[in-house]
């Protein structure tokens, strides 16, 4: 690949455009990838009489099992950092979003943390797992039947008057649907006051 800038001079956005995005889109359908996805609105801080909001947290890439079921997060860094430099940040986002796979890349390759097995590894750009491979690893770990998959893959109710769920609401919905799919007869949903249980 011929580029205008040397790799070490590229910004994070250049690395994403030239290296990471092509590596991911060659293995995943673009309809199951989102970029620069806002995770939080940013922490609200109070300093005296001033109220201000910190910058929102954004995931560079989210890969989806289905519409409301993200399966992997990818954090990109420029090439002046190691392949695994963004892995801790990706893992933080994965924990927040209840996602089983976290990846980071600097354009030379990928580092992966698999929350299902606890294993970490590094591999080349052309070795990124395909959509089918990652989904098979996920479903294989949980041993889902086709009937259970159907329940879990149900889309959320939406209308013109509903807002998209916040990340913690999505987690609560998905965990509830997962428990129902597994045939659990009794469920207890605990969320703090004001967090949107009536979503």
Where are these regions (language model features)?
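ATP-dependent helicase/translocase motor core
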Residues: 1-199
């Amino acid at each position: 690949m011929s580029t205008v800038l040397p790799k070490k001079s590229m910004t994070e956005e250049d690395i994403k455009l030239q290296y990471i995005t092509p590596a991911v889109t060659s293995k995943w359908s673009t309809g199951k990838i989102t970029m620069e996805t806002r995770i939080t609105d940013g922490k609200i801080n109070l300093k005296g009489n001033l109220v201000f909001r910190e910058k929102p947290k954004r995931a560079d890439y989210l890969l989806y099992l289905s519409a409301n079921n993200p399966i992997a997060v990818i954090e990109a860094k420029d090439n002046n950092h190691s392949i695994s430099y963004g892995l801790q940040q990706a893992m933080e986002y994965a924990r927040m979003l209840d996602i089983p796979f976290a990846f980071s890349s600097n354009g030379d390759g990928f580092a992966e943390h698999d929350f299902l097995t606890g294993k970490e590894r590094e591999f080349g750009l052309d070795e990124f797992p395909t959509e089918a491979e990652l989904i098979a690893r996920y479903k294989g770990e949980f041993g889902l039947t086709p009937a259970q998959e159907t329940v879990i893959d149900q889309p959320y109710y939406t209308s013109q008057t509903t807002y998209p769920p916040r990340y913690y609401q999505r987690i609560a919905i998905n965990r509830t649907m997962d428990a129902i799919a597994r045939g659990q007869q009794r469920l207890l949903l605990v969320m703090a006051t004001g967090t949107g249980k009536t979503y």
